Every structure is written in C-alpha cells, then in structure tokens.
C-alpha cells in the first residue's frame, strides 16, 4: 500500500471573510467553529488517519510563525514540515511545490492527500473511509 502524505494548504489572506480575517491573520488561523482554528481542525483531521506520513503544511512567509505556534499548541504532530510559499499564487503552485518536496523526501508512489486548511468536514468517519479507499 502506498504511503499517504497529508498536504495542508494554509496560504492565502482570507480576504473574502473580512472583517473577521485580516491580511496578517487570515481565516485559516481563526477559531470559527470551536476552540481550534481551521488550520488546527485540519491538522487534527489528518492526524486521525491511520498510517499517514507527518503533515506537510504549505503556508505564506508572513504566516510561518503563527502557523508553527498553532501546530505546536495541538501537540498532535510529533513531526511536521512547513513549506514556505515565497509569493501566494493560489492552489496549483502550492500543490506543485508540495509534490516536488514529496518527490525529494518520500518513497516513489507516495500519494498526496490535499487538504485545504479552511474546509469544514462534519462527518469525520466518512472522511476516513473515503481516504482509506
């Protein structure tokens, strides 16, 4: 069975959720549903998957420190990698950067599980079933 590399896309400014989100504090870093941010909720979702590699988090340079702080607060990931986007250019370049990184650091055949940090998944059990398929 191929290894699964969770890739959490946490870039962007969250400008469509203004005034809640700001350029330096975008929606993926906000606590909108419960006591965890959308990024933290996504990390928890990925950490509950069986036999996955440590998460790869793609984030803009300006959010690197708060991202690290939020990940470390969870204490759910002993290991993780933050991959910095020098410039935000939307989803495709972020996924390409993650694929290139994974190709250099993981075994051939590793499957990338792309997880936008600002998505809300209500049925965790079904999510896990679909990923397992």
Protein language model regions, located:
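Conserved N-terminal catalytic core of the sugar/cofactor nucleotidyltransferase
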Residues: 1-8, 15-26, 31-116, 122-128, ...
């Amino acid at each position: 069975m191929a290894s699964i590399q969770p890739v959490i896309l946490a870039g962007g400014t969250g400008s469509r959720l203004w005034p809640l989100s700001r350029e330096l504090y975008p929606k993926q870093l906000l606590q909108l549903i419960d006591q965890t941010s959308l990024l933290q909720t996504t990390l928890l979702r990925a950490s509950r998957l069986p036999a996955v590699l440590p998460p790869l988090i793609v984030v803009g340079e300006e959010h690197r420190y708060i991202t690290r702080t939020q990940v470390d607060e969870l204490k759910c990931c002993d290991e993780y990698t933050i991959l910095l986007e020098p410039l935000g250019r939307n989803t495709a370049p972020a996924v390409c950067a993650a694929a290139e990184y994974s190709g250099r650091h993981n075994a051939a055949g590793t499957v990338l599980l792309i997880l936008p940090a600002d998505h809300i998944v209500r049925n965790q059990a079904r999510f896990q079933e679909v990923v397992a398929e």
